[in-house]
Amino acid sequence: MSRITLSRFLIEQQRKAGTLPPELRLLIETVGRACKAISYSVNKGALADVLGEAGTGNIQGEAQKKLDVIANDFLLDANEWGGSLAAMASEEMELPYHIPGEYPKGEYLLMFDPLDGSSNIDVNISVGTIFSILRCPEGVTQPTETDFLQPGTHQVAAGYTVYGPQTMLVLTFGSGVHGFTLDREHGSFVLTHPDMKVPERTAEFAINMSNMRHWEAPVRRYVEEMLAGKTGPRGRDFNMRWVASMVAEVHRIITRGGIFMYPKDARDPSKAGKLRLMYEGNPMAFIIEQAGGAATNGHQRILDIVPTKLHERVAVFLGSKEEVELVTRYHSEQQ
């Protein structure tokens, strides 16, 4: 049986009752090509002098790695001329990126975290790209930040690429979740993980335990119960994982189950969380829900949150449905 490439898969989906518009198909393929280029740069590492700091900072006040800038440029350059987009937005840029006047404009908005987990680059741990696609509001020809401020339920597609021992693109456009592995010999993403599902039950959790003293009471209660293992109220043992790369954590969870948590904490009560809603929380929540899992901010479904700014932050609890529902219930009981 012949292998199914990303291009073939998308074309076949387009033919099935027209569930995937041609312009959206082309946009997803273009994002995939940009991710291939990022993968090659990440893999070269010190050989291409792409490790270390860039000497600049992003809108979040974070020091940029060289590969943050390189990945951001790859995504901008690959997508600006294709005719599918009205504008783009990135973790690395304060304002939306407008399509240059010499290129045709399309009906979609693309948002991305070009290189999630980039603090891991220099120590050779998996990093990744996260992206979200929305429709541009009808009649808008020069999108502003306001046009991006749509709830996650409005996403028409989302995905991530994990750059690890293999490079994998994981994608949804509202009809399940499918994983594609990069065949470097042929330069194509190939369908290797069709219809991915998150197990409902799990014995693994991912959280940065060093911040425990700053957590709200419901999070401490939930984690302490898991740490108590068989002798505690849960009656079974759990294992903890922490990679400090959201893409790597989510990929593990979608592959074998688990819960990923990045709660708000007391160090800065004005911030709703650490992760960004529009290009981290929303796309990952869309993917996890399409795979049968759940995603909340501790109080409500992440996809239902109406954003108020492009770089808005959010607390994140996502993964196996049973665990996400439990920690969310603990938050509601605390109110």
Swiss-Prot record:
EC numbers on record: 3.1.3.11
Top-rank taxon: Bacteria
Keyword vocabulary terms for this entry: Carbohydrate metabolism, Cytoplasm, Hydrolase, Magnesium, Metal-binding
Listed Pfam families: FBPase, FBPase_C
Binding site for substrate: 116-119, 208, 274
Binding locations of Mg(2+) 1: 91, 113, 115
Entry binding sites for Mg(2+) 2: 113, 116, 280
Metal-binding keyword on record: yes
GO biological process assignments: fructose 1,6-bisphosphate metabolic process; fructose 6-phosphate metabolic process; fructose metabolic process; gluconeogenesis; sucrose biosynthetic process
Subunit structure: Homotetramer.
HAMAP family noted in UniProt: FBPase_class1
Record-linked NCBIfam families: PRK09293.1-1 (NF006778), PRK09293.1-3 (NF006779), PRK09293.1-4 (NF006780)
Family from the record: Belongs to the FBPase class 1 family.
Protein name: Fructose-1,6-bisphosphatase class 1
Species this chain originates from: Chromobacterium violaceum (strain ATCC 12472 / DSM 30191 / JCM 1249 / CCUG 213 / NBRC 12614 / NCIMB 9131 / NCTC 9757 / MK)
Gene coding for it: fbp
